[in-house]
């Protein structure tokens, strides 16, 4: 199930300068999603879970030298999927983007993973080419949510064991209270569940 918001855009691309792109492999049930921030953006993160897989999230802590990011990557493939960030960095570098170190521009791309290796084909994982393709696909259109990109193999409800897993997905939102703008994007392996239909939210309702 995939939800496209064609009317009012309540996704993060409603924020000026934000573009989102997906790379999706439906047969292998994996993918990645990139959020590009034109002009760079201040970001924060809250890392949770018993086995988080992240890249460059430590630099988002207060007091770090680099205060702004160029993109965020959410990816399937567990820790292997972090390689997709290399493709995002390559795409940004080709555009002359990144943190100016004085000798080179280094694109800042925090990334986080979803463990989806047990859902589809464990041998197919997002890599550098997938991250690059997600950047090429990025646009300011309303974000296609649910089953796509990093949400393709996302699951929830596994506390009692993987046999109880239900289909997850990807969602995003933006909030503009009193001109203080916030935006968020989450893979619903950590947040709420999208696409649960019959039978009982299994992958057969894709």
Regions found by a protein language model. Name each.
Residues 1-206:
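Alpha/propeptide regions of enzymes that mature by internal proteolysis
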């Amino acid at each position: 199930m995939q939800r496209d918001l064609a009317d009012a855009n309540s996704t993060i691309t409603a924020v000026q300068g934000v573009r989102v792109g997906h790379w999706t492999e439906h047969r292998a049930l994996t993918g990645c999603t990139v959020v590009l921030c034109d002009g760079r953006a201040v970001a924060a993160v809250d890392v949770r879970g018993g086995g988080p897989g992240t890249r460059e999230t430590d630099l988002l802590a207060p007091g770090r030298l680099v205060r702004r990011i160029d993109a965020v990557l959410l990816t399937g493939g567990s820790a292997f999927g972090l390689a997709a960030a290399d493709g995002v960095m390559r795409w940004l570098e080709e555009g002359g983007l990144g943190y100016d170190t004085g000798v080179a521009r280094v694109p800042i791309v925090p990334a986080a993973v979803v463990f989806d290796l047990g859902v589809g084909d464990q041998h197919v994982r997002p890599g550098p080419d997938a991250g690059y393709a997600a950047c090429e696909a990025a646009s300011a259109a309303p974000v296609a949510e649910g089953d796509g990109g990093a949400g393709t193999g996302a699951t929830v409800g596994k506390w009692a064991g993987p046999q109880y897993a239900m289909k997850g997905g990807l969602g995003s939102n933006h909030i503009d209270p009193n001109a203080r703008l916030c935006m968020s994007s989450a893979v619903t392996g950590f947040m709420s569940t999208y696409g649960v239909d019959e039978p009982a939210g299994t992958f057969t309702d894709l």
